[in-house]
């Protein structure tokens, strides 16, 4: 195996998140679906945006959030995704560069604007996302840089990349290159709406290409069309090397061959916003995995990094995750 430059390269939608606090009536009056990611066109996104008072406007996107978390932990990372060379696209490029992440994908100079996600957070801290993908949809296999794939230990792909045939082709090219260079492919299901729309394609991708799977309990059950959690775990077991399944306040379950590892969740006094919790769990887990930690410790790190993002608005960490994880692991009697 050749030497690597990056611990992880992630591939996903490059978006800017607009975060706003709303009441449940805001959603019900507009017949907006709570708790999921809903794709909208530019006009609808603009209409929702006009009706809220934004708390923050920050770079986002699931896979981009994950590498931002990894970079905060001290990992070497790259990102592949598409923006337009407009104001929001330049904001995204500045933010990801400031985080220490290599981002070489050429921006669009014409066509759709940079994608944005209006993230509405209700008093129960649940996030409802209304996403205009815009330029993000224009990712093609030409954007998949063979050298970056070759130079990365793990290729991390988000489940939101399904709505355009060209995006799917890009995913397959990345997976095939990963196998060519004996790299591992990690995949996050991302959202139950993605599962319900693309179940068969997802299962095919997982079966043929994925080594490491991330999902939450509801997503894994939806993937196998069952209400039985244990049945879903049995379904995924022969398909991947590692499955990391989160269960909110009940922690996470790691499935590896015949082994099941149960890890408790971090205790959080006040959950402010659930946006990005799954993204940051994946960041912590992958950091542990690329740095030789046991699967149990990987899950513990994932729990720590997910917990940090639950305590504030936005999906990017607000403290040094490296220092936080070191402190927490020492407190738990684990090697920092």
What are these regions (language model features)?
Residues 1-80, 90-91, 98:
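Glycine-rich phosphate/adenosyl-contacting loop at the front of the ribokinase-like
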Residues 1-9, 14-15, 28-36, 176-177, ...:
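Conserved phosphate-binding/catalytic region of the ribokinase-like
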Residues 67-76, 120-122, 288-291:
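Alpha-helix C-terminal capping segments
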Residues 77, 103, 185-186, 243:
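Hydrophobic beta-strand scaffold residues
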Residues 95-112:
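A glycine-rich helix N-cap at a beta->alpha junction
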Residues 104-108, 119-164:
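Conserved phosphate-binding/catalytic loop of the ribokinase/pfkB sugar-kinase fold
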Residues 154-234, 250-252:
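Conserved beta-alpha-beta core of the PfkB/ribokinase-like small-molecule kinase fold
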């Amino acid at each position: 195996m050749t030497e690597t430059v990056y611990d992880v390269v992630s591939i996903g939608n490059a978006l800017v998140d607009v975060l706003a606090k709303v009441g449940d009536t805001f959603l019900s009056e507009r017949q907006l679906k709570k708790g999921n990611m809903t794709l909208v066109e530019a006009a609808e996104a603009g209409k929702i945006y006009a009706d809220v008072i934004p708390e923050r406007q920050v770079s986002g996107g699931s896979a981009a959030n994950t590498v931002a978390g990894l970079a905060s932990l001290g990992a070497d990372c790259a990102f592949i995704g598409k923006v337009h060379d407009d104001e929001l696209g330049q904001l995204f490029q500045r933010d990801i560069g400031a985080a220490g992440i290599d981002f070489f994908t050429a921006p669009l100079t014409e066509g759709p604007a940079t994608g944005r996600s209006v993230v509405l957070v209700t008093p129960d801290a649940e996030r409802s996302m209304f996403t205009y993908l815009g330029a993000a949809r224009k990712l093609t296999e030409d954007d998949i840089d063979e050298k970056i794939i070759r130079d990365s230990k793990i290729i991390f792909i988000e489940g939101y990349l399904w709505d355009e045939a060209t995006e799917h082709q890009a995913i397959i090219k990345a997976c095939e290159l990963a196998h060519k260079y004996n790299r591992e492919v990690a995949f996050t299901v991302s959202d139950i709406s993605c599962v319900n729309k693309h179940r068969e394609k997802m299962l095919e991708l997982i079966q043929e290409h994925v080594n490491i799977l991330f999902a939450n309990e509801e997503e894994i059950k939806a993937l196998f069309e069952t209400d039985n959690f244990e049945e879903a775990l049995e379904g995924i077991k022969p398909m991947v090397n590692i499955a990391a399944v989160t269960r909110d306040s009940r922690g996470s379950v790691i499935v590896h061959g015949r082994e099941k590892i149960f890890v408790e969740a971090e205790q959080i006094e006040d959950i402010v916003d659930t946006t990005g919790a799954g993204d940051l769990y994946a960041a912590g887990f992958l950091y542990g995995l690329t740095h030789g930690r046991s699967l149990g410790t990987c899950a513990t790190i994932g729990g720590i990094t997910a917990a940090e993002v639950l305590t504030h608005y936005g999906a990017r960490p607000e403290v040094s995750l490296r220092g936080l994880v070191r402190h927490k692991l020492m407190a738990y009697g684990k090697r920092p």
